[in-house]
Amino acid sequence: MRIKIMKRFPAVLAAAGLAILLPGPAWAASGPQPASGTVLVTSVTVDSSSAADGNTILVITISGLMNGTFDGTFTETDHEVIHPDGTITLAGKGMQSGTLGTCGTGSAAYVIEAQGTAAAVTGRFQFIDQSASTSTPTKIHSVVTFTGSTITGQFTYTGTYYCT
């Protein structure tokens, strides 16, 4: 038994040495990486509308384009509440398809939350549900904030992501 282990030991050492010396692929980078870019909303559809306690409650479908670290198309369904004082709160889920930073290409689900007014909102989105992701070669996790105009549909985003 000792002879078998000793015969394999040099090969194991050589493989470990190569793993340390050779750089890994870009998608295997450890730690958070910066994310930034722009969003353009190209379509907004009101799926349903109701009222409760002076609030207007909307279910909306939003589609658009992302450019930058995350590059491609997105579609999301949001629950938006317009409060009597004019402020807006929003929560929803969506799917981003295209380039997902250095993690690869494919589709990844995300959740979104935002608040603001009828003219401008700020919020955050986060890629979730890795089992539903089709990104290759690796999956993605992120925490990204955004701000922009609901009038023009133009937003900017910044944050971090890492490949899992």
Predicted feature descriptions by range:
Residues 7, 20-22, 29:
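Compositionally biased, intrinsically disordered/low-complexity regions enriched for serine, proline
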Residues 29-164:
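Beta-strand-enriched cores of mature, soluble protein domains
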Residues 2-13:
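Bacterial N-terminal signal peptides that target proteins for export
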Residues 11, 24-26, 33-35:
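Generic low-complexity segments that are intrinsically disordered, proline-rich and/or Lys/Arg-biased
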Residues 13-23:
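Bacterial N-terminal signal peptides
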